[in-house]
């Protein structure tokens, strides 16, 4: 819900994409870009509460197999996109450049943001202005440490924005990370890479990278990660949605690293299951118990939290309650892998308060 940069912009109109990005980006040791092939798409849920799409593919020589799950929840504050990555190395891999994920791709990165910051749920670790260079790294392989590590790309150069583009700051939050690279356990690392699209048109691409000193991936290596991509209006006046908490945050801190940190911290949920089993904390997924019921306590959160009740034998005969009040808007999907149904809804977060979410059976 962000107005584009143009005179007489209207609500609910079209705004250009605010970023671009890419999954596995690999240039081999000779600098040749290695395309992925055999992409297979599985549309498991179309929304409206939470989409769920999976992409499976492999590199052109079969060196790396990739699976990417992408979900976008309903929201009235700002865009969140949930990404689950799994890369499996099948053959030795060497590279001139390798990125497990890019925020802003080499040839799709429209917002002229001039500052980058990194941190975790406790706050800021470092902020800097990347060098304006062409096809070289500004800073390679910085370790991301702590819980809920994040990267913010902000400081938009307003004079460089094109008419009709949305002015946005962007962020990437690493919700979980597990990797073996070069036969050893590896933490996440971030690199900043400079590009130039025509004279003086510099952009910065943020990449999740291998650790420094690593030159080859071996068969059996893998990366498994849960990421959250977020986009915020870089101008508080451009936001026309109903979320007062976001509006207040933007009024104070728009186009800084603080909105990304706020999201990383505010949605680092630690729910407690009274019935059923929590299989994912955010977005929240609960498997029902043997009686097809679930009960979970959630404290805090920002925006609307996507909640999925999985393991249902039937799509009918269920009632979702939040603090005793029925939820009237949800979606029901068939899970072909488990051969069970699931119900998905979006629950308004309690910020600093505690809420009880219950799935009951109806007569």
What are the functions of these language-model segments?
Residues 1-62, 67-69:
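Acidic-aromatic substrate-binding/catalytic surfaces of carbohydrate-active enzymes
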Residues 42-114:
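Acidic, contiguous internal or C-terminal segments within carbohydrate-active enzymes
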Residues 82-88, 290-300:
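Short beta-strand elements of extracellular/lumenal beta-sandwich folds
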Residues 90-180:
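Polysaccharide-binding surfaces and accessory modules of carbohydrate-active proteins
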Residues 96-106, 295-316:
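Surface-exposed beta-strand/loop patches in extracellular or lumenal glycoproteins
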Residues 105-121, 309-326:
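Solvent-exposed beta-hairpin/edge-strand motifs
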Residues 140-279, 286-287, 334-362:
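Beta-strand-rich recognition/accessory modules
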Residues 321-341:
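Solvent-exposed beta-strand/loop surfaces of large extracellular or lumenal domains
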